[in-house]
Regions:
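Active-site bordering "gate/hinge" segments
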Residues: 1-281, 292, 302-369
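Short beta-strand elements
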Residues: 284-300
Length: 369
């Protein structure tokens, strides 16, 4: 229920109308039943439950927005036409929104060395030029567990982090110098801004039922709602894909993948490329550099790298950090509100949240998983 199907178990089987271990009519019918069951659960349980609870938590439509009403990033995915990544083909859009300007969508080019750069000023890594940002093709992952200025305590018992401290094993990726949020909310808002019909209809329906404006999407509950709406859309898309798969097989089209560049011996000795995807948690990119026929560098910038990133040289906060600013906590030693906002990102990591008093005394420590 994260917004998209995982098809590895299917794709590796191959396509053929014959019986045996390959995908045949029996398997197609089985997959269709899974798609229908998924739609049934989402439409009869997941979505109604969320919409039933939303009126009791309307204040969470105003909390936890962070970067969501400012900077959003999507790589685009799910082309409906084979090998066509144009805007008319993509179900999930490509683009970036900066400073909350929904009427100004910027194209995202993952091969442009100036668009995406990672910084390590507040991370436990080192670069030859400490303040410089590196495009993933030039990326360096060289650990250096150094606490930095302003830190009180030891490496095994940190008491206080200063503004100049290093505090994360995550780098700080930035798009054209901006901290970005990525994920279902970014995709749904970008699609809404582009007036893509399926997403626009889903968002308008949900907002109407909840009795809130579009601005409510930029929040903790809006982030949770976006994931549910995307699940509705992708479950329907999964059923459509099954029907298309069956039609292709019946028409004699048994091609399962573009094999044009599958054989490594056909590649240049030196080349570089990038493999992007819109994963459940957001924009995912793997950048690869090949020299002398072998991999010389491989860098992955995953959705949680964007969302959980630490500060950058400009002091810009990552999406998690920005979303927690201004969050009211009713009981200091039971900070459920912090958990609620971080969980809305669906984090793929475990982290500790320390709640401190204004005097610097630790009130509690909560593991976020």
């Amino acid at each position: 229920f994260l917004g998209m199907p995982f098809i590895g178990w299917l794709a590796k089987r191959g396509l053929t109308p014959d019986q045996g271990t390959m995908v045949n009519q029996i398997w197609v019918n089985y997959i269709r039943d899974i798609a229908k069951d998924t739609i049934k659960f989402i439409e009869e349980v997941y979505y109604p439950d969320l919409m039933a609870m939303a009126p009791f938590y309307k204040d969470w439509f105003k909390i936890g927005g962070g970067l969501s009403n400012q900077n959003l990033l999507c790589y685009g995915d799910f082309p409906r036409y084979a090998n066509d990544l144009s805007e008319k083909s993509l179900l999930m859009p490509n683009g970036a929104i900066i400073d909350g300007k929904l009427d100004e969508i910027h194209p995202v080019d993952l091969k442009d060395p100036n668009q995406i750069k990672e910084f390590v000023d507040h991370s436990w890594y080192q670069y030859p030029q400490p303040d410089a940002g590196l495009h993933p093709w030039d990326g360096i992952t060289d650990p250096k567990f150094e606490l930095g200025a302003g830190t009180e305590g030891t490496k095994t018992d940190i008491k206080w982090l200063g503004a100049e401290s290093r505090y994360s094993w995550i780098k700080a990726p930035r798009w054209n110098g901006h901290a970005m949020e990525t994920g279902p909310l970014a995709r749904m808002v970008l699609a809404y801004a582009k007036k893509m019909p399926e997403q626009t209809e889903l968002v308008n329906e949900a907002l109407s039922k909840a009795g809130v404006p579009i601005q409510a999407m930029f929040s903790t509950l809006g982030r949770t709602l976006a994931r549910c709406l995307e699940a509705r859309m992708m479950a329907r898309e999964m059923l459509r894909c099954v029907d298309e798969l069956e039609a292709n097989i019946k028409a004699g089209d048994e091609v399962a993948a573009n094999m044009e560049k599958w054989e490594p011996s056909t590649w240049p000795l030196e080349c570089k490329g990038v493999g992007p995807a819109e994963a459940p948690r957001g924009a995912l990119g793997h950048w690869c550099v090949i020299k002398d026929g072998v991999i010389a560098n491989w860098q992955a910038v995953v959705p949680s790298t964007w969302n959980a990133s630490p500060r950058d040289p400009k002091g810009q906060l990552g999406a998690y950090e920005a979303a927690l600013l201004g969050t009211p906590v009713a009981v200091a030693n039971q900070p459920l509100e912090i958990l609620r906002t971080i969980h809305s990102f669906d984090p793929c990591l475990a982290c500790a949240t320390h709640v401190l008093s204004t005097e610097g005394q630790e009130l509690c420590k909560v593991q976020v998983r």
